[in-house]
A protein has these predicted regions:
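Basic, polyanion-binding surface patches
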Residues: 1-212
Length: 212
């Protein structure tokens, strides 16, 4: 199977290959705020941890909206797409919250990916509750078992996508997932993305002992 970058119709082929083969992927359920105070919520499965010291997470909105950056990226980075204000550009908030959706929030997470009219709330459309973040200018999903408040660390354009890195400022974790103040995966059931409309849970687990 040959994939040639830049060839006609190769974006679709590459997307189907990579999104189908690189699975399951964790899902960043990202909330952000526009300059006019509108709260946005959307899921992104090109997402992971990239550093522990400092604690940095990355997600990447793939592709662009017809009029430029997708709402999440524009809210964080501003019209210039850099996190800085250009001539005539609105500055971004440089802030966002990454939620991890559990399986029982799958329908809500999926609903938040709908294309809504400007000013419509993805929180309301998905039936979840916005709660003001403690440290950053954004709302978070009250029902999410894990939420990471982040400040923009770096952003990079990669082809037609935008890689956004955020430094973890504050974490919110459901008490049932904590044992002696440490994260306990026993009752954690995060949603994973496969391909198309397929998702995975993490109920079936395999434990391996690491070799010396």
């Amino acid at each position: 199977l040959m994939i040639r970058s830049g060839a006609p119709d190769e974006f679709g082929s590459a997307y189907r290959l990579l999104s189908g083969a690189v699975t399951p992927r964790p899902i960043a359920w990202v909330s952000s705020r526009s300059p006019d105070g509108h709260d946005n919520l959307a899921p992104y499965s090109f997402f992971n941890v990239v550093s522990i010291d400092p604690p940095v997470l990355m997600f990447s909105p793939v592709g662009r909206a017809p009029d430029g950056l997708k709402d999440t990226a524009r809210n964080i980075l501003g019209d210039a797409g850099t996190g800085e204000r250009g001539d005539g550009d609105a500055a971004g908030s440089s802030a966002f919250v990454i939620q991890l959706a559990s399986v029982d929030l799958a329908e809500a997470m999926n609903a938040s990916s709908a294309t809504l009219d400007h000013g419509e709330s993805e929180f309301e459309h998905a039936g979840v509750t916005p709660v003001e973040a403690d440290e950053v200018d954004a709302a978070r999903v009250a029902e999410a078992p894990v939420a990471f408040e982040c400040e923009l660390y770096e952003a990079h354009g990669v082809g037609g996508s935008t890689m956004i890195l955020g430094e973890l400022i504050r974490a919110h974790v459901d008490e049932v997932l904590l044992t002696d103040s440490e994260f306990d995966i026993t009752d954690y059931d995060p949603l994973g993305r496969l391909s198309g409309g397929l998702y995975a849970d993490t109920r079936n687990r395999l434990e391996l002992e690491r070799p010396d």
